Amino acid sequence: MGHRNTVLTILLTISIAIMVLIATVFVSNNKTETLLQTHTQTQTLITTGRVSRFLAQNAKNGRNLNAADHCNKEEEICKSQGMYNSTMACCSNKCVDLAYDNDNCGACKNQCKFTQTCCRGECVYLAYDKRHCGECNHSCLVGEFCVYGLCNYA
């Protein structure tokens, strides 16, 4: 009879512990949901017609803030963004650097393959190219091989 009472006591204790755990999880879930709802309601974005001082100042100077998005109208916009030997060009109405842009490598719409990278206007495999080993313009020494982007990988 003593053994039976012990088993019943253990089962009763376990069932009470499970009920308390379920109640705690249920209450904390409800609190989390209400906190989320109140946080979402207070985070509504209020927009005004006012422009910041910085943007207003640039607009007053006559500078077109979206000039790079409209380079077909003025070809020289792209050239002015780079230096003297600039490789900037206007492709698909955007200013791009033909030396390092993977979608316009060397010429407009010349897209590099999936594992290739545009270096100096040509598509190369950084993992195996001796002139661009691991990164653009990182050359391996004479007699070394580029393997997995490392010179003389052993």
Curated annotation (Swiss-Prot):
One Pfam family, short name: Stig1
The UniProt keywords, alphabetically, are: Signal
Highest taxon above the source species: Eukaryota
Could you confirm whether the keyword Signal appears in this record?
Answer: yes
- The stretch of residues making up the signal peptide is 1-23
Which family does the record assign? Answer: Belongs to the STIG1 family.
Entry protein name: Stigma-specific STIG1-like protein 3
